Structure formats: C-alpha cells, structure tokens
Amino acid sequence: MFRPLVKRVVTRRFLAAANNSNAHIEIRTLEDLAKLQSLDNVDPKLISKLINDKTNELNIKNELQMLKQLQAEEQKTQETSLKKFVRPAWIFLLMGSIVYLSCHYVWWKLDYEEKELEYTHKVHQLESELAALNEAHNSSVSSDKNSKRSSRKWYKFW
C-alpha cells in the first residue's frame, strides 16, 4: 500500500524538480529548447521568436550560398565566353574563304572568256588585214614583174 504512494510521490517530486530546473534555465536558442524535457512552462511567443530567428538565419545562409554560386557561375561564363566563339569564328573564316575563292574563280573565268573573245576577234581582224596586205603586195609585185618584163629586152632573158 505504501509502495504505490511512495512511487507517486517520488515521481511528482521528480517532475516538479524537472519543471523547476526548466524555469531556472535561460532559453536563448532552439538547442536550449531541445535540452528541455517538456515545453509546458515555456512561453509560446518565445518559441515562435526562436523559430523565426533560426529560419531567418538559415534563409540568410542560403541566400549567401546562392550568391556565391551565382558569382562562381558568372566568373566561369566570363572565362569560357571566348571559348564559345572560337569554333564559330573558324567556321565563319572558312565559309568566307570558300565564298571569296569561288566568287574570285567565277570572276576570273568570266574575264578569261571575255578576253578570249576579244583576242579571237582581234586575231581575225589582223588575219584579214594581213591577207589584204598580202594580196595587195602580191598584186603590186606581179604588176612590177609585168612592167619589168616589158621593159627588158627579150634576149636578156637568156
């Protein structure tokens, strides 16, 4: 009969001592709250204030970490920005060279054909002049021969 009574009294004293120890502990952080056995004697406003403070602290840490990551990514993109344009620059130079050389070849070929036509026309013109001069020369030579033969005496031929 006394045993259950003693057990109850000891349990109550232990709980009262625990509550008194909670009252004497100064609560400043959530870790202090975690050390307590119960939150019965703790002001709810204090709990919400501690939770809000910890949340703000974690948010600030996350924002700082995110800013550091953004700065690192920005530096990385600034370093690799030149690398992004090297291959397109080579492709542009190659394509430009191909276009330039093909246009130059077409221009050269057209110029060659134009000069070839001009030179063939000039050759035909000079050939006709040469033929006319040759014909004129032959006719003058034959007339000179005829005139020389007539002026010679017939016996001089022998």
UniProtKB/Swiss-Prot annotation:
Belongs to the INA17 family. Residues 1-15 form a transit peptide. It comes from Kluyveromyces lactis (strain ATCC 8585 / CBS 2359 / DSM 70799 / NBRC 1267 / NRRL Y-1140 / WM37). It is found in: Mitochondrion inner membrane. It is a single-pass membrane protein. The chain crosses the membrane at residues 86-108. Its main location: mitochondrion. GO terms for cellular component: mitochondrial inner membrane. Component of the INA complex (INAC) that promotes the biogenesis of mitochondrial F(1)F(0)-ATP synthase. INAC facilitates the assembly of the peripheral stalk and promotes the assembly of the catalytic F(1)-domain with the membrane-embedded F(0)-domain. Residues 110-140 form a coiled coil. Residues 109-158 are mitochondrial intermembrane. Component of the inner membrane assembly (INA) complex, composed of INA17 and INA22. Interacts with a subset of F(1)F(0)-ATP synthase subunits of the F(1)-domain and the peripheral stalk. Keywords: Chaperone, Coiled coil, Membrane, Mitochondrion, Mitochondrion inner membrane, Transit peptide, Transmembrane, Transmembrane helix. Residues 16-85 are mitochondrial matrix. This is Inner membrane assembly complex subunit 17.
